[in-house]
Amino acid sequence: MNDRRSFEQMLACYCAPVLKKHKAANMFHMDKAKNLSIFALIREYNEKLSGKQIQIKVLQPANSRITIFVFQTKKLQQILKRKDVMLFLQSFGYPLPCSLQTLFAHLEQRLSMATAYPHEIGVLLGYPLHDVVGFIEQRECLLRGHWNVYRHPRKAMQMFSLFERCSKELMRGVRHGIPIEQLI
């Protein structure tokens, strides 16, 4: 399988809800050694998706295993403007309000710390703040799916179902050779 096809399959599998505008962001990991043209592909797809207000950011580009963060610019900015989210992220040292570039620089710094994974990233992915806090505090969850749910399980189940439909639709299209930018 070529690098482009592999990359599109990863986008369809992990980021369909973002690409279909139902979620602020999502991420996945790739081994650089298995996809040698990954940075060129990301530049290409950033160009293809820019008119749709979707961006792809590489986190930890020096690592052998990189994190690919796909996000809707406006939705992420809206999340960051919420007072409760700002206070939450500021408690982890994020210098809010700030540009997305500054936000990602701080997130990179947090990811590079060996002590613990920065689970506050869940808020950036668009998960409900109360669910991110519940996860960090290791509470008992009510439901597990795309994220651990601590409140409003019925609403979360509806979102999980929507996300699954998006992924299946995009994966089917990619399998049939349709470019991802034509599927969204």
Segments from the language model and where they lie:
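A structured, charge-rich N-terminal accessory region that forms the first stable segment of a protein
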Residues: 2-62
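Short, surface-exposed beta-edge/turn micro-motifs
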Residues: 23-25, 64-66, 118-120
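A glycine-rich, hydrophobic loop/mini-helix early in the fold
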Residues: 41-98
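Short linear loop/turn motifs
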Residues: 63-64, 102-104, 136-152
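Short acidic alpha-helix initiation/capping motifs at coil-to-helix transition points
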Residues: 80-81, 109-116, 139-141
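Internal catalytic-core helix/loop-beta-alpha segment
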Residues: 92-119
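Hydrophobic/aromatic-rich, well-ordered segments within soluble, folded domains that form packed cores
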Residues: 117-143
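Long, compositionally biased
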Residues: 146-184
